[in-house]
Curated annotation (Swiss-Prot):
It comes from Marinomonas sp. (strain MWYL1). The keyword S-adenosyl-L-methionine does not apply. GO terms for cellular component: plasma membrane; proton-transporting ATP synthase complex. It is a peripheral membrane protein. The lineage of its organism: Bacteria, Pseudomonadati, Pseudomonadota, Gammaproteobacteria, Oceanospirillales. The keyword DNA-binding does not apply. Belongs to the ATPase gamma chain family. This is ATP synthase gamma chain. The gene is atpG.
């Protein structure tokens, strides 16, 4: 039964694939939990440094730092964060669509765009798409450190300091839960003023060195922390999306195996019926 042999080969092949996707699902689930822990651990630092920056800025209202001053947007920069690997559903495609939609609003008004791509998928996409990629970073792995991103972020901060870009945005995926990841665009520079009564409160701190010098340094650290937080959150999204994609692949493989098994059983039944008919016909002829 040649047909039956082919079907058994297909079933065996798909079953082997199902074993791989099931293993990848379990690995992704483990990495998702670790990524969530890193995300939760880094969030308090990002929030606290934002508060300190707010206190310093309100304590020195006469000092207008360039990162706090709005200016006409003639050229804008985007830090687009993606994964280094695939097999994570539409995670990267969704963030690219979000970035392009936001960029189009500026491009339609003649504003030029610079891109810092983080993650090999973003680098390859925007280089093929034709974007002006001024900085790129790949190979961050599953547990990146803030220092790994300093170089790429510095390229965009230097461009802002020198007036080559007038605004800076970060595009990444927001982790809602293991089933939901939303692509978002956040403005990094200039910093938007927040209506926060706690930040407006006068804090009687003693600064060493001067508050202005601390503010200069903290604003850079703040931008770096925000980008790092976005990268860590995007990694959690990547692992959650991969876990879901591998689960769907495993389930689909099971459905295909069931269908092929049914086809095999029908083919085997037909072959047996034919053999019986031939035996009966032969006996009748005798």
């Amino acid at each position: 039964m040649a047909v039956g042999k082919e079907i058994r080969t297909q079933i065996s092949s798909i079953n082997n694939t199902r074993k791989i996707t099931r293993a990848m699902e379990k690995v992704a689930a483990s990495k998702t939990r670790k990524a969530q822990d890193r995300m939760a651990a880094s969030r308090p630092y990002a929030e606290r440094i934002r508060q300190v920056v707010g206190h310093l800025a309100n304590a020195n209202p006469e000092y207008k730092h360039r990162y706090l001053t709005e200016r006409e947007a003639k050229r804008v920069g985007y830090i687009v964060i993606s994964s280094d690997r695939g097999l994570c559903g539409g995670l990267n495609v969704n963030v690219f669509k979000k970035a392009i939609r936001d960029m189009k609003q500026f491009a339609d008004t003649g504003v030029e765009i610079d891109i810092c791509a983080i993650g090999s998928k973003a680098v390859s996409f925007f280089r093929n798409y034709g974007g002006n990629v001024t900085a790129a970073h790949t190979g961050l792995g599953d547990a990146p450190k803030a220092d790994d991103l300093v170089g790429s972020v510095k390229v965009m901060l230097d461009a802002f300091d020198e007036g080559r870009i007038d605004r800076l945005y970060v595009v990444s995926n927001e982790f809602v839960n293991t089933m939901t990841q939303n692509p978002t665009v956040e403005q990094l520079l200039p910093l938007k003023a927040e209506e926060n009564t706690e930040l407006k409160h006068h804090w009687d701190y003693i600064y060493e060195p001067e508050a202005v010098e601390i503010l200069d340094e903290l604003l850079v650290r703040y931008i770096e922390s925000q980008v790092y937080q976005s990268v860590v959150e995007n990694i959690a999204c990547e692992q959650a999306a991969r876990m879901l994609a591998m689960k769907n692949a495993t389930d689909n493989a099971g459905d295909i195996i069931d269908e092929l098994q049914l086809v095999y059983n029908k083919a085997r039944q037909a072959a047996i019926t034919q053999e019986i008919s031939e035996i009966v016909s032969g006996a009748a002829a005798v």
